[in-house]
Each structure stands twice: as C-alpha cells, then as structure tokens.
C-alpha cells in the first residue's frame, strides 16, 4: 500500500491539531537541581517575584531569582524528599502568615504554624509578610513612653512608643536579658509583645519561653522561633513574619513591642541564601541589598495616626493611634561596632543601647555604657517625673567615668574631685539591677531622687542596693498615698517632693537597711 505525500502531510496535520498539551509551562515547571534548600526550576514563565510555589509532599517554596531560562527558589522547610524532575506549580499567592489575638501565648515558626504542642491556631485573618512601611503622612511623632523597668534605660536612654532602639553588644553581655525584661515589664500596660528568635539554640528559646510563662508575660506575647536547626530561609523570613503579627495590633489602634533577637543571624541566613542563589557578593560576602534587608523591616515599626487606622479598619476604629516599637538586637565581634551590619542597623535605628563586656564582667548589670548609648527620639516620650530626676544621673556618670580614668594616675585628689568620684561610684552601684525584677515608675523616681539629693553620699557602696530595697519597702507600707499620686500623675509636684524627701529622711533615721 502506497501513501501519497499529500495524504501523509494531512495525517500529520490532523494529529498535530488534535494534540492537547497536558502541562501549561506558564504555571508549572520541573525541578532541575536541589542543593542546600535551593531549587532550580525550568518553566514557570508566569511566576512573580516572591510568589509561593507548591512542591510535591505539601511543601512550599519562594521564588527569589527570576532568570531567562530558570527560576531560583528557596524551599520553606524540609527539602530532602524533593528530587530532580519533580513538578512545581505556581500558587498565585504571596507568602502570608496568620495574624490576630489568637496567636497570643503561642510559639510559632516563621510560617505561623504552631510548634508548642498546644493544638492548632484558629486565626481568623492572614496577612502578607512583606508590606510597605507607613508613609510620612500616616505617621505621628513619638510622645508616649515604653517603660522597660530597667533603671539605666528608663533614666538615661528612654524608649518611646513607635521608636526603633538597637540593643548592641558582644556575645554574653545580657542583650536578650534586657529585651526579655522589657517584655515582662509590659504586664498590665496594654502593650502586646512579639519575640522573634532567629538562629538561636532551641534550648535557649525554650528557656526564654519558660521565663515569660513564669512571669505571666506569655499571655500577651507571641513567640516566633526560627532555631539554628531550621533552614536559612526560615531564619531570614521569621523577622518579617513577626513584624506582620505586630502590625496587626498597630493597625487596630493598639500598641505593640517587637524584639528581633538577633538581626546579625538574620543577615547571615540571608547571605547564605543569596550566595546559594549565585547572587554577586559584596563587602564581607554580604549581597548588595543587605542594607535594604534591615531597613524595610525596621521602617515598619512606627507610630501611626488615627486617620491611617480609620482607613485601614474601614472606619471600625476611630480616634486611636497605634504603634509598633522595635528592639532589634545586634551581636558584635570583639566590640567592633564599625563592621558592616552593625553600622547599617545603627544608621537605620533611632538610637542604641551599647552593652560592654568589661562592665558585665565587673558586675555592672545591665552592662550599659552610658557614654555611647543614646536615644534620639525617646526624650520627648519620657515620663515627666523621670525626666525631672534623670538629668543629674547621666551627668554624674559621665563625669565619674572621665575622672575615674584620670584618678588612676593622680595620687592626691582635691575635695571636689573626690566627692564626684564617690557620687559616681554610688550611682553606678544604684543602677545595677537583678534580672526579671523590673521597677515601677514610683520606685525609679524614689531611687533617682535619693541619688540626686545626696541621700546616698554617706551610705557605703556595698549597702546601696539594700538601702534602695529598704526604701521601696518602707514607701510601699507607710506612704501608699504618695506612691499612688506619683503613679497616677507620672509627675512630682512640690508637695509630693516634700513628702518624698521627708519619707527618705525618716527611713534614713531608722537605718532599716
């Protein structure tokens, strides 16, 4: 049997016309390679930057590199079961996490999934993890305080609602302790907290969660944990996920506090992801956009005005301002604050609390260096009573540090210098504080007043903290009215000042310490 060439061409034509392509190359692709949690995928020509991709086995990934022939994606979670030739699908969605009050008291991973064994979280809303920070018009100036309960911070480096205050120092200088104390002190103050643990040991995170639970702070706190054993992608994303959870409260007229512990490890995780995606390295092998990595995160912490909240809630919440206060943590190497990531974050934030190894080892805890720690906007938010009383403390400490260095070489000192040194020693001792024991405003006011007015000058340095504790106990038992007035007004009137002076004199005579 012979076939005409025309018949053959007709046959081929009908076959081609009848062929239906099973896969759409726009929305599906094939895995070319998998290395260290990074997938190269062929196809997916319609994928968006930052879009969620679906891998086999209910695993998701994030499209980060869009190239001519392939897509570089990072796998969120386990990737051992993914192999070459697997099919990948576009989801058409940007990465979202659950938000809302249902998350309070829970420990979740970077995707908002519970990891504390307390059952599922029935959150009613989800939100995207990458958002544009509020614009200039939507913001309001920082004017309300966040009390950390730490004497040295509330007196010398005050933090306001909506501020970004960096906590920076070497390893083992008490950075996490400062942040956790600040969270514990928000009990009963109406501030919701988010603690983001990035790249820490799982045992360390468990310890922090246990301490928060012991002090009744977990009920108003969300813990977002990306441990050292989690993938670099999860560590990099956890900060943005935590920020979105905090923004939920900010955009409903509430106040929230978020701690990023720590952003150095987030930068390391992002560097790892970027190098695996073959992006060109820059200074210290970080990618070119490592500044943007932190700036777009920290700019989302702000105080927003009532109009912004009304617009976002469609008129449900009126006449309320909201705030998200950020306490990013940066770990330095041998006190080098001029390294790449520390200088970046210092320039983004509104001030820094610098913790020093030498002070920590000398027993000054929290080990805050008062000379180079600053708060660029917190002064406007400081409570009136603390603002009145704290000016002298900072001056005393600064002069003491200067004189102490000079006094090492001088044998005979004049009376004024000796007095200044004695006062400085007592103030340094007074600012020491045990962990998990934050102070209320009236306690801080009483301590500062005693220091400023020379009541500590004839108390032995070793007895200062006992004197302070005795004074607080006496005021609590005998002068409850005075305490209530200071707490209510957050100010010290002339009458209250006279009453406080009389109370301290009375306590000193009794020498109950």
From Swiss-Prot:
Main location: membrane
EC number(s) reported in the record: 7.1.2.2
Reactions this protein catalyses: ATP + H2O + 4 H(+)(in) = ADP + phosphate + 5 H(+)(out)
CC annotations in GO: plasma membrane; proton-transporting ATP synthase complex
Protein task: Produces ATP from ADP in the presence of a proton gradient across the membrane. The alpha chain is a regulatory subunit.
Subunit and partners: F-type ATPases have 2 components, CF(1) - the catalytic core - and CF(0) - the membrane proton channel. CF(1) has five subunits: alpha(3), beta(3), gamma(1), delta(1), epsilon(1). CF(0) has three main subunits: a(1), b(2) and c(9-12). The alpha and beta chains form an alternating ring which encloses part of the gamma chain. CF(1) is attached to CF(0) by a central stalk formed by the gamma and epsilon chains, while a peripheral stalk is formed by the delta and b chains.
Annotated protein name in UniProt: ATP synthase subunit alpha
Organism expressing this protein natively: Ralstonia pickettii (strain 12J)
Gene: atpA
């Amino acid at each position: 049997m012979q076939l005409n060439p025309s018949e053959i061409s007709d046959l081929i034509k009908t076959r081609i016309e009848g062929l239906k392509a099973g896969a759409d190359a726009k929305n599906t692709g094939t895995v070319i390679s998998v290395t260290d949690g990074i997938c190269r995928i062929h196809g997916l020509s319609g994928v968006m930057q930052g879009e969620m991709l679906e891998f086999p086995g209910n695993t998701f990934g994030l499209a980060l590199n869009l190239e001519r022939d392939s897509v570089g994606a990072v796998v969120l979670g386990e990737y051992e079961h993914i192999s070459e030739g697997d099919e990948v699908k576009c989801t058409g969605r940007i990465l979202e996490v659950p938000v809302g009050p249902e998350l309070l008291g829970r420990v979740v991973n970077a995707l908002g999934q519970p990891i504390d064994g307390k059952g599922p979280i029935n959150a009613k809303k989800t939100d995207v993890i990458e958002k544009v920070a509020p614009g200039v018009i939507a913001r309001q100036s920082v004017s309300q305080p966040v009390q950390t309960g730490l004497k040295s911070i509330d007196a010398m480096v005050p933090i306001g609602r909506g501020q970004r205050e960096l906590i920076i120092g070497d390893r083992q200088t008490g950075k996490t302790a400062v942040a956790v104390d600040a969270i514990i002190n928000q009990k009963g103050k109406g501030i919701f907290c988010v603690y983001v643990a990035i790249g820490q040991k799982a045992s360390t995170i468990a310890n922090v969660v246990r301490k928060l639970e012991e002090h009744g702070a977990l009920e108003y706190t969300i813990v977002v944990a990306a441990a050292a054993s989690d993938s670099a992608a999860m560590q990099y994303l956890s900060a943005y996920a935590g920020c979105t959870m905090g923004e939920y409260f900010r955009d409903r007229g509430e106040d929230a506090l978020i701690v990023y512990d720590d952003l150095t490890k987030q930068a390391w995780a992002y560097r790892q992801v970027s190098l695996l995606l073959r992006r060109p390295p820059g200074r210290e092998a970080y990618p070119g956009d490592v500044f943007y990595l932190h700036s777009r995160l920290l700019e989302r912490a702000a105080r927003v005005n009532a109009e912004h909240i009304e617009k976002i809630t469609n008129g449900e919440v009126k006449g309320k301002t909201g705030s998200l206060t950020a306490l990013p943590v940066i770990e330095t190497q041998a006190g080098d604050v001029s390294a790449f990531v520390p200088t970046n974050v210092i320039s983004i934030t509104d001030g820094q609390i610098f913790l020093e190894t030498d002070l920590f080892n000398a027993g000054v805890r929290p080990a805050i260096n008062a000379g180079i720690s600053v708060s660029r906007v917190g002064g406007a938010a400081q409570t009136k009573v603390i603002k009145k009383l704290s000016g002298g403390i900072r001056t005393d400490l600064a002069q003491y540090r200067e004189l102490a260095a000079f006094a090492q070489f001088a044998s005979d000192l004049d009376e004024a210098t000796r007095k200044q040194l004695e006062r400085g020693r007592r103030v340094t001792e007074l600012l020491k504080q045990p962990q998990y024991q934050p102070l209320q405003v009236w306690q801080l006011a009483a301590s500062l007043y005693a220091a400023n007015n020379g009541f500590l000058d004839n108390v032995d340095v070793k007895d200062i903290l006992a004197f302070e504790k005795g004074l607080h106990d006496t005021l609590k038992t005998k002068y409850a009215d005075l305490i209530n007035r200071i707490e209510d007004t957050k100010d010290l009137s002339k009458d209250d000042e006279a009453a406080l002076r009389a109370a301290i004199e009375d306590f000193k005579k009794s020498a109950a310490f």
